């Protein structure tokens, strides 16, 4: 099994171009699967049948797996068994009749406009790291980028003259996202004045640098955003994805085209973007007051 799993992981990394984070999730799912099979003395892939998989799923449910995690686990092992059958490592695919559980997709908190402004205005612009943080927050809210996308950004991916940023999303898919005047202004000063001071002796092309001149990490960005959220007295769960959700929600609330928002977010399936068509409480109150004859 170990050999087949490694062959499969190599396949999805090379052939499908999946990110390291996605590969890591697949690897963790397959480790759970392999551990369960070994604990139950299943030594060969062709000994696995539908009943064994269902018992494995029952075990994961007993261990407290959420329906979302379970759905991803099933997707992983289904893809794995399809690969094994196609490459003749196995004589059958035992996942054929296994159903994927449905789960409710929940959005994290979305910031109101005044909360976004409070967050953006929190960094100290007199300090290099403060100016960097303001620029990064402006860019996250202006583009709806994922945290993994922003740490992969190089200086050359930002075209200030034409007003766009080139983003490499899931599966290394490239997309172009426009930039507004405000974020262009911050990016210009950051790239020309602040970043060279953060760069020190390093030669990295990464856009956002830590105080040692190296690329900001995923954990570093999460920590920065959480810290400013506390300073701005925002009583909501605040992550880089909160700004992404706020970006999409505010665009759609103000009449943006769903397809255009899908393109900017880098969603392959428009149903994912449609999650943002929920209307905020303040927007509901505004519409009620504006349109109800007895409001």
From Swiss-Prot:
What is said about its interaction partners and assembly? Forms a cyclic heterotetrameric complex composed of two molecules of XerC and two molecules of XerD.
Which PANTHER family does UniProt cross-reference here?
A: PHAGE INTEGRASE-RELATED, TYROSINE RECOMBINASE XERC
A Pfam short name: Phage_int_SAM_1
Active site (record annotation): 146, 170, 241, 244, 267, 276 (o-(3'-phospho-dna)-tyrosine intermediate)
The protein's matches in CDD domains, at most eight in alphabetical order, are given as: INT_XerDC_C (cd00798)
Q: Please identify the protein, giving its name as recorded.
A: Tyrosine recombinase XerD
Organism this protein belongs to: Staphylococcus epidermidis (strain ATCC 35984 / DSM 28319 / BCRC 17069 / CCUG 31568 / BM 3577 / RP62A)
**Subcellular localization(s) per the UniProt record:** Cytoplasm
Similarity section:
Belongs to the 'phage' integrase family. XerD subfamily.
């Amino acid at each position: 099994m170990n050999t087949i799993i490694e062959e499969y992981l190599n396949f999805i990394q090379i052939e499908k171009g999946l990110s390291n984070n996605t590969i890591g999730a697949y690897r963790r799912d397959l480790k759970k699967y392999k551990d369960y099979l070994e604990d139950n003395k299943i030594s060969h892939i062709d000994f696995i049948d539908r009943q064994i998989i269902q018992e494995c799923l029952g075990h994961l449910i007993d261990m407290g797996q959420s329906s979302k995690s379970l759905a991803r686990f099933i997707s992983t092992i289904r893809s794995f068994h399809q690969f094994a059958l196609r490459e003749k490592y196995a004589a059958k695919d035992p996942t054929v009749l296994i159903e994927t559980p449905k789960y409710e997709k929940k959005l994290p908190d979305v910031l109101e406009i005044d909360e976004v402004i409070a967050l953006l205005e929190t960094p100290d612009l007199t300090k290099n790291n403060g100016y960097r943080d303001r620029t990064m927050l402006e860019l996250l809210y202006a583009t709806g980028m994922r945290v993994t996308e922003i740490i992969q950004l190089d200086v050359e991916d930002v075209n200030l003259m034409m007003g766009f940023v080139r983003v490499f999303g899931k599966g290394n898919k490239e997309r172009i996202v426009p930039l507004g005047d405000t974020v262009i202004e911050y990016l210009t000063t950051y790239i020309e004045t602040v970043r060279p001071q953060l760069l020190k002796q390093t030669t990295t092309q990464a856009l956002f640098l830590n105080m040692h001149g190296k690329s900001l990490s995923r954990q570093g960005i999460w920590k920065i955003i959480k810290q400013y959220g506390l300073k701005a007295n925002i009583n909501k769960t605040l992550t880089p994805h909160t700004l992404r959700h706020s970006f999409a929600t505010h665009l759609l609330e103000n009449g943006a085209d769903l397809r255009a928002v899908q393109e900017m977010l880098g969603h392959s399936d428009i149903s994912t973007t449609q999650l943002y068509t929920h209307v905020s409480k303040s927007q509901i109150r505004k519409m009620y007051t504006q349109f109800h004859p007895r409001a």
